[in-house]
Amino acid sequence: MSEPDRIVSAVQRGEDIDTTMRPQSLDEFVGQKTARANLKVFIEAARSRGEALDHVLFVGPPGLGKTTLAQIMARELGVNFRSTSGPVIAKAGDLAALLTNLEERDVLFIDEIHRLNPAVEEILYPAMEDYQLDLIIGEGPAARSVKIDLAKFTLVAATTRLGLLTTPLRDRFGIPIRLEFYTVDELQAIVTRGARIMGMPLAEDGAEEIARRARGTPRIAGRLLRRVRDFAYVAGAENVTRQIADAALSRLEVDALGLDQLDRRYLHMIVENFGGGPVGIETIAAALSEPRDAIEDIIEPYLIQQGFIQRTPRGRVLAAKAWRHLGLNPPKELAQSQINLFEEE
């Protein structure tokens, strides 16, 4: 099963791009209370001074609203919004074309900035710091350096892997913001709003059931809501209750805590093949036939956040909660070995 095929994948699909479902202002945006409060201050200050907002870096797992927040920022600043992603900017000319078309105070959003070509990144430094492009025109003896003045713009970038950003690039962002997983209450509010927009009758306990299985991620909550709507429609349900939501999500193999077949396979593999751990990430990747990056970026963050696994110097170890979730009793010797592992950290 590839990552995009999972219904609980936070990777964006075409069906997830529904502009009617997206909040249009910071006041409408649910969750990320600290980030929203700080952004309001920074936006109001920049708007009052008539200046470009400092460059912003959003850090966090996929599906938490980084793109939506960038769009809201541009809307509340009253400026144009341009969007691209790191892998798309293949060469310096691509970046130059983007930057030279920006107007004063415009917002340029670069998703997956950690995947930016290193040669392109070098061009970005003076653009961010001095609002200048420093390009080499021509080759050999005829080559010459050309400086191009740029409009004072705001770069808003997003990354799921802060550690892959170079220090010079990371240090040029004046406003770093880390986004966190959402609470069940926040996701319930998002699901309720989505159902209202879709004209879908949804009981409070039905919204809560969907929210509890959405892995702390609004994008997944929206996807689960659409699939539950399909099941409810075919079943002729007039109102989506907890019972209907539970039946639909169980059919989709999403359990009560939001784990799917791949998550359970991950946990079962560590129990059955390695006695609960510790086991190294490369071994896990080989056993699951999944790329290491996918495991570290997509599967493990939620399992760690839920307290199912721990990363130790000797590898991954299942916590007692994971054993119980699988219907198993954690061995006493494993509990003792976990204590010893954390004493070594």
UniProtKB/Swiss-Prot annotation:
GO biological process, alphabetically ordered: DNA recombination; DNA repair
Catalysed reaction equations from the record: ATP + H2O = ADP + phosphate + H(+)
EC main group: hydrolase
Gene3D superfamilies named among the record's database cross-references: 1.10.8.60, P-loop containing nucleotide triphosphate hydrolases, Winged helix-like DNA-binding domain superfamily/Winged helix DNA-binding domain
Positions of region (Large ATPase domain (RuvB-L)): 4-182
Binding sites annotated in the UniProt record for DNA: 292, 311, 316
Subunit: Homohexamer. Forms an RuvA(8)-RuvB(12)-Holliday junction (HJ) complex. HJ DNA is sandwiched between 2 RuvA tetramers; dsDNA enters through RuvA and exits via RuvB. An RuvB hexamer assembles on each DNA strand where it exits the tetramer. Each RuvB hexamer is contacted by two RuvA subunits (via domain III) on 2 adjacent RuvB subunits; this complex drives branch migration. In the full resolvosome a probable DNA-RuvA(4)-RuvB(12)-RuvC(2) complex forms which resolves the HJ.
Annotated protein name in UniProt: Holliday junction branch migration complex subunit RuvB
